[in-house]
């Protein structure tokens, strides 16, 4: 918001000619509104709460603490993705057994990398928040 000072100035003649003329300037209604808006904006900025740097520090500490677990999960997922791409070729996910999908078969029969990935995914979380607990039938 650009604040432009607009004023109306008028020369006022003194009653006696010995006095100098004075200039009286009055702000227009528009500039008063702009100044009032600027004042409200500055007041709101002063009353706004400061950013909490403690939250960022807590998140960084939590991330550093979970780094080893996250690296382990990332490696297991990489191996599991390779195993998923080879399940049909290797014969670990064949037709009669894969009716509910290869993930279900891997969880129940223990396909090497996929089953390990599913177990590691829920490590460090409570049972309710784990996204890998999708199975239709469990052991």
Swiss-Prot record:
InterPro entries: PSAN, PSAN_sf
Membrane topology according to the record: Peripheral membrane protein
Keywords associated with the record: Chloroplast, Membrane, Photosynthesis, Photosystem I, Plastid, Thylakoid, Transit peptide
Source organism superkingdom: Eukaryota
Boundaries of the annotated transit peptide in chain numbering: 1-53
Localization of this protein: Plastid, Chloroplast thylakoid membrane
A Gene Ontology BP annotation from the UniProt entry: photosynthesis
Cellular compartments per GO CC: chloroplast photosystem I
Keyword Plastid belongs to the record: yes
Function noted in UniProt: May function in mediating the binding of the antenna complexes to the PSI reaction center and core antenna.
PANTHER family given in the database record: PHOTOSYSTEM I REACTION CENTER SUBUNIT N, CHLOROPLASTIC
UniProt family annotation: Belongs to the psaN family.
Protein name listed in UniProt: Photosystem I reaction center subunit N, chloroplastic
Organism from which the protein derives: Volvox carteri
GN (gene name): PSAN
